[in-house]
Amino acid sequence: MQVMTKPITLAPAFIAEVKKEIKPHWGELGWVTYKRTYARWLPDAQRTENWDETVKRVVEGNINLDPRLHTANPDPKVVETLQKEARNLFKLIYGLAGTPSGRNLWISGTDYQKRNGDALNNCWFIAIRPQPYGQSHIVPEDYPASQPAVSMPYSFMFDELMKGGGVGFSVTKDNIAKLPPVATKLELTVVIGRNSASYADSLKMGAVDRDEWEKAHAGEQADHCALPDTREGWVLANAKVIDHHFAATNPSGQTKLVLDITNIRPKGARIHGFGGTASGPMPLIEMLLDINKLLNARVGQHLTAVDATDIGNLIGKTVVAGNVRRSAEMSLGSADDEDFITMKQDQKQLYHHRWASNNSVAINTQFDAYSPIALAIAKNGEPGIVNLELSRRFGRIADRENAENDPDVEGTNPCGEISLANGEPCNLFEVFPVVAVEQGWKLKQAFTLAARFAKRVTFSHYDWQVSRDIIKKNRRIGVSMSGIQDWFLNDFGRRVVSGFESVVDPQTGKMVQKPIYDPEIKQAVDGLYHTVVDADQAYSDALGCEPSRKHTTVKPSGTVAKLAGVSEGMHFHYAGYLIQRIRFQGNDPLLPALQACGYHIEPDVYTKGTMVVEFPIRAAHADDPAFASAGTVSIAEQIATQAFLQTYWSDNAVSCTVTFQPKEADQIAGLLSQYRHVIKSTSMLPYVGAGFKQAPKEPIDVKTYKQKCAAIHGSVAAVFAVQNADHDQKDLELVDQTDCAGGACPIK
């Protein structure tokens, strides 16, 4: 790809005019969440970005991915068209009528994006089976790149997690059966030089003094590797440990490996690129020793799905400790694998590392053993359900079945809204219909811009060959809508499920309650789906590439929905009125501004050095007779709403965390069976109102809400600017925030 000599940019005069015309639709938490999540540090100005600067960066980073600009002499008409599109995108995103994924808000338009094409995609999927590294940016030197290796999917996972992405991975029986037996017991030694600032801490984690070890083991045969101070170095270290256990990647049967961690930067050192500070080598030491111990215990045996998940979880745990604030994993096992389904009941292992993934099981439409799964869900909210058969054979359920619809699907991203092939990422943009209409957009125009934004992301330079190949083949996009419940009430005055009728399931003979859907909402959603498909086809024709295999989704949203103050994805508001508690680092200069504006602030009872700020929130249409919250809407209506969106809107999948009351637990198995031909993926959690101190969300009544609001005055943004003379501090984030309602995704 040629480098552009003159990329498309947005003129300062244009941006100034937009700022006069359009007011961003900030939610109650919007500006504060943005400032501590997506506003990048500007070293020359010694402050973080303002919203218009973020949007400018994001739009310019995206529009210039259009491959027609990467030629010696781009067509002037193409340049003019894209320049106009960039202006419209700026208006759409600046007003918060729609936004790309949190990953794009953080990375698009940065040097990091240019170096790491993977960085624009939030989440990925990989199958745990031996795979070749191929022409990828990370390839072990000990064997040909064409050699299938057990380490490859774990290297892919480790790499993408450290770039801030989430990873779904499959440990279903068909994949696990392809893993060879563990052949070699490995004596792993991690050494460190005394000149390392991490020397003392590393010894505590199990490393040994390099000089002393070399003196005591002079002349011994062992593989040695000095790890470089890079992300790739961490990945390759883990690959070496795994590879030494298997015959195909350790044909000599070498039983000793020495890894030198002296060059890894110490805790607190700057991390350039993605941002943040280093953890030091200590988490890496712990992970390498734990994984080696696990594999040594299986010599002469095949790994189980639990073993394979444990390795993934140990990697995820390390990434969290390595200063990527959240590591999102979803492990997909077989529905008849009892050990996998119950693996989190081992409390010791759960607290050590098994917390690192949400676990789901793969089913098909013939599966009918829902009772054990329903009991497990009622107990701890897992496993989730993923119907791979539906994902492969259907786009929208309303459209005809086709065995070639999406035949390569093997799993999903951690939140379950995108059906994915091996090595494939999700690629998201969401529109907030209520905000878009309020700001004068025709919804067809907003969704067309969304489709084109996502399409351009597929032309990034991807680091892994497995990803490049499948992205070029599928060009998958995921245009989502969020604030769906707000939209239904605002534009149609009612929820989409108008009632239920009793019918007999022709396969089971059981009586079920079939939902009745509002025809006007159905027509509107169906029309917008075809808008996205048509926009993708037109753009694909112009670019000379394949149309996207699938186009639409409902992402769970979360942080991005907070920006605009809308309901999250298809989810119902948590309550009509509530206190939302946000945790800040104790030295955050936003805290004095929030205090000056009257927000209640108190120390976090769980974490030292953290402050909790209370934000009173009123859901849109909270007083509407048709309003329902997650605490009042039935489990049946939630699943029926998900089924509606899977039928008429999403050709990928619909991410939904269905909440249920204790008295509804006995309905879970029946509902999962009833919708086995409709719902591609779902998860369920018991509804928790405010069962512990400083809960993130606490339902309140309208009187309490008004009392809380009466104490608040002024603009936090304005007060912050005055107090800090338009300066800020670097590397501050909100604590324990996630990019989705279910908590599975990284924040950015």
UniProtKB/Swiss-Prot annotation:
Region (Adenosylcobalamin-binding-2): 692-733
Chain intervals for the UniProt region annotation (Effector region-2): 172-320
Keywords: Allosteric enzyme, Cobalamin, Cobalt, Disulfide bond, DNA replication, Oxidoreductase, Redox-active center
Record entry for activity regulation: Allosterically regulated by ATP and dNTP.
Catalytic activity: a 2'-deoxyribonucleoside 5'-triphosphate + [thioredoxin]-disulfide + H2O = a ribonucleoside 5'-triphosphate + [thioredoxin]-dithiol
Region of interest called Effector region-1, as start-end residue ranges on this chain: 151-162
Coiled coil: none
Protein name: Adenosylcobalamin-dependent ribonucleoside-triphosphate reductase
